[in-house]
Amino acid sequence: MKIEEKIKQKYLYSKNFNFIKIIYFFIQFFKSKFKYKKSYSFGSQDLITEKFFKNKKKGIYLDVGCFHPVIGNNTYKLYKKGWEGINIDIDFHSIDLFNFFRKNDENIQIGVSDKSGENDMFFFHNRSAINTLNPIRGKNAKEVKKIKIDTLNNVIKKTKFANSKIDFLTIDVEGYEMNVLKGFDIKKYSPDLIVIEFMDLENKTDDIYKIEFYKQNLNKILNSELYNYMIHNNYSLVNWTFLDLVWVSNKFKKINS
């Protein structure tokens, strides 16, 4: 038996606590806390994207409803890998953070919809990830303001990615996802992977904070406008994590089969 194994047998595998075992536990604790940060997303969506794009060193992402550049972010892992893209949010504080932490990206403050102009914005508080353009989702908002909106197509045209293929699209806009998609040329930009938050707007809860993933209904997803839209545009639903649905392009699946 090697010396290392003898030490483990004597001290680490002992039923009694000892100094070496305590030091070992502390090392493991701090390694798990600081060294092995695996996911930044709220529901580990970035682990799916990391595996999906494991062989792609450079790529382009589009994050609508980005909110924070690191915490709960689906694209930060890709950014660290060398990717770049467009981050969009209605909150200028969020865009300030992105401009500081994600200098290689194009970070834009605007509301995204299926039309250009102005729209009511439903505020729960200024720095809230649940502020929304959706009147049903925002029925108990504390304040309503008019904000500038534009289509995703128009927003992209004003960036350096206007004629680029989008590899990864993620949308989290609190029940306004279909409006965003309708203003996006999905055939032109043809993302290989799309992550979209799914909101059951028929959920009658008066407390927006009580909408949880375990209250989602698979039948409602399969009969939703979003599902039919994505199937019609040649995407397959391949995963469901937290509140997000994960879609893969059938073209990508065929090429990589």
Which residues make up each language-model segment?
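Phosphate/nucleotide-binding beta-alpha loop and adjacent structural elements of enzyme active sites
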Residues: 1-257
